[in-house]
Structures are given as C-alpha cells and as structure tokens.
Amino acid sequence: MGRCSLLLLLLLIAFLTPGAANPVSPSLRAPSSLPWSTSFRSRPTITLKYSIRYIQQKVDHFGFNIDRTFKQRYLIADNYWKEDGGSILFYTGNEGDIIWFCNNTGFMWDIAEEMKAMLVFAEHRYYGESLPFGADSFSDSRHLNFLTTEQALADFAKLIRYLKRTIPGARNQHVIALGGSYGGMLAAWFRMKYPHLVVGALASSAPIWQFNDLVPCDIFMKIVTTDFSQSGPNCSESIRRSWDAINRLAKKGTGLRWLSEALHLCTPLTKSQDVQRLKDWISETWVNVAMVDYPYESNFLQPLPAWPVKVVCQYFKYSNVPDTVMVQNIFQALNVYYNYSGQAKCLNVSETATSSLGVLGWSYQACTEMVMPTCSDGVDDMFEPHSWNMKEYSDDCFKQWGVRPRPSWIPTMYGGKNISSHTNIIFSNGELDPWSGGGVTKDITDTLLAIVIPNGAHHLDLRASNALDPVSVQLTRSLEVKYMKQWISDFYVRLRKMN
C-alpha cells in the first residue's frame, strides 16, 4: 500500500469512529451563568444494565431484487424511562462492537434519569455481531457492497420505527440521536435525512467537513502538532527531528538490528520497507495520544495516564541529542501508550488501538465513501512531508478491494457546508482533538450550534463525568442537556397542537 494512503488508513482505523484556534463561545467563559445539570455531580461508578436484542434488517433497503436479511444487534436500557414525558436517546453506532461504544458513552447513562430516557445503542452493520453475510461479510467487494452510510442510517430508521411500534408507551415519544466521531457524523446525517424520526442530534467530534477540499488536508496534523507544542518545551521539534534520526540509524550496517533492540520490537526490522512501516506506526501513535488526551487515567484505545501528551513530552525535552539517545527517548515515549500497564514484553508495530474497532469494514468504507484526505509538510507540523495523492490512494483501494473511491459522494449526499436548511443539531468539538479541523466549530444558524471545548479531547463530552473533568466540558454537557430539553419541549408543544 502506498505511503500517503497507508497513513490515512491507519488514522481512519483509529478514528472512531476536531479547530484548535477557534474562539471560545462567550457562554463557555462564564460557567456560572448557566444552571449546572445535577446529572454531572460526583457519583459512584454506574453499573451498566442493559438488554441485548436483535432486529431483522434488510441487507439492501434501496433495491427490490434482494430479500436477504440479517440480525442487527442493539442494546436497550429502560431503568429510568418514563412513558409520561420521557424520551429515547438513540446512539448511532460507530465502526466497532456496540458494547464497547456503550461502555465508553457514559454521558448518556449520566443523564438518563434526568431525561427520563430509554437508552438505545444500535450497532452499525458489518461491525460487531451485525454481519449481513456472516463469516463471508468481508470476503470481497460484492459482499461489502451494502456497507454504506445510507444503508446504516436506514437500519437506524427502521429500528426506531420498530421500537415505537412494539414498546408500549413509546409510540409518541421523541427521539434524540447521539454519536461521537464517525458515530457523531451519522447522528448529524440522521437528523438531516430523517428529521421526522429524530427531533435533534448531538454530534460530538464529528468531522463532517473532512472531505473533498472542504478543509485543508494538513489541518489534522497541524492540530496534533499544536497539542504537543503546548504540552512541553521542544516536544514537537524533537519529534520533527526524530524521523531523520531513525533514517540515519537505519542506513548503518547494523542499524536495523539496533533499532529493533532499542525499541524492543516484537518483530525485528529486516528491510528498508520495514523502516517506513515503523515510522507510520510511530506517527499514528502520536496521533492517537493527541486524540485521547483526557484529564484522567483512561482505557479507551489503550490504558493511559492522565494528560498523556504531557507525559509523552517529558521524554522529548531536548531536541539536540545524539540519534541513539533520540531513539531511546522515542522508546520511553512509546511505552506511555503501549505499556502504561507495565505488562508488555515487546512493542508490536501491528497494534495501535483496541481490537473492538472493525479494521476490515472501515478500510472498505475509507476506500468508497469515507475518503478524508490528510497531508503534512514537516514545517508547520511535526511529521515527515507527505502530500495527498488521490490517484495513489485510489489504486491502493482497487488493489485491496477492487473498488474505486468516490471522494465527492459524501458532500453530495449530505450537503457539504451547505446545511443551513437543517435544524436542531449540536456540533461539539474539543480544542485538543485533531478531528476538530474537519468539524463544525462555529454556529451556522440559531439551531445548528457549535460548541468548542477548551482542554477537550476526542468526544470527551460523551464520556462519563469525572471529578477531574475541566470546567469547560462540565459546562458543555449542561448546555447539551439544556438544548435537548428545549427540543423535547418543542416536540410536545407540536404534538399537543396536532391532537
């Protein structure tokens, strides 16, 4: 696989599933001006209790020649649900096992009682247990042909109609879509395409504009670099210089063996191509650390300390060091991400994130609809220079899957930046999150709202409340609940008028 497309693909796999320089909303500067939601006070860890259920879905919602169906998995929790004045909070599943996303979306559980909400977590087709063709689902592009955002949204639509029809008391209840990362994109698009089924959507860390020249391709890597620059003196500069240090050592007679031993690699480097793979892996590691730069210990992609970027930067205080020292510093920094638990005996360049993410499914989506360009120049960012090469990317996709990407289809389907006719969507983005560069970070209308979260990483607002949360994310969650309650109020006003 080509260099630029491999890096993009690795980034997208870590996605899941965004502008650091944007001004902070005045409301975020005055947290005392908004009543705090009682849902976010310090509380003991909640035990998640849900039922696992399945619904038969059509493999193809839009054609009439295929009658095949499959079982879509979904989770449902109704502990706090009330028929009178209640709500349905519907999580639009990402590119992975839905139980994993359920366990990492504590915000919904935190507000369930206050919102009198039934919680529904819908698994995305081709991920987790929701496989349209079972073991053959990833065998070729013919079986993968039904892995599209449109088909996934149709699954969600049918599931909502089914729940309202079969659960007593749910028929006239409003539904709010929620999601983070790719799931956040789906939540926003779901509100756009099915406004009669959901009264609003919370799209957290949803880079809906990371497509087809809607934003510069280098914005992602620039934000990663800013995170590291702000987290330690000389940190980003040291990383920028580290690539040449690796290259110089690799060219020496015993360089590959020395690098393998110094970095404690599980699989030794044996050829020059392995060096590029090593650097790709290291690059993705720094990206992932920036994404999950949470203010407390976490275990989202990997077990990590609080503020992991700052911890990593402790090993990059000095940029003018011998190459061997630089590589030893790289090893110590990599250990923060891959061996915080202290149990790893070696570092595996094939490992970057949790196995709960669906690698095969996402690589196909990245080769069809979800074409999200990234590039770097090595000057305004800390990575090696790599341009975006659409032809190379397309050729790699064709070689792997036998398909050609359609980079303009998502903007065509969902409107690109021309979305002002839609309503009731909250776009929340953390300033630390690289994906914020492709997200909506300024209000579009009075009902298409943007919240930029200072000191916030990838969909931090969707995570469970924590005593170490910055005030900015506490306020963000209260704002989100405030807007959702307004949508509910407006919904019941319209319902009474109809009756």
Curated annotation (Swiss-Prot):
Domain of life assignment: Eukaryota
Keyword Hydrolase: yes
Residue ranges annotated as propeptide in the record: 22-47
GO terms of biological process kind: angiogenesis involved in wound healing; negative regulation of systemic arterial blood pressure; proteolysis; regulation of blood vessel endothelial cell migration
Keyword entries, A-Z: Carboxypeptidase, Disulfide bond, Glycoprotein, Hydrolase, Lysosome, Protease, Signal, Zymogen
Entry coiled-coil feature ranges: none
GO terms of molecular function: dipeptidyl-peptidase activity; serine-type carboxypeptidase activity
Glycosylated residues in this chain: 103, 234, 339, 348, 418
Disulfide bonds, paired cysteine numbers: 217-375, 235-313, 266-346, 367-397
Family to which the UniProt record says this protein belongs: Belongs to the peptidase S28 family.
Protein's job: Cleaves C-terminal amino acids linked to proline in peptides such as angiotensin II, III and des-Arg9-bradykinin. This cleavage occurs at acidic pH, but enzymatic activity is retained with some substrates at neutral pH.
Name recorded for this polypeptide: Lysosomal Pro-X carboxypeptidase
Species per Swiss-Prot/TrEMBL record: Bos taurus
Lineage of source species: Eukaryota, Metazoa, Chordata, Craniata, Vertebrata
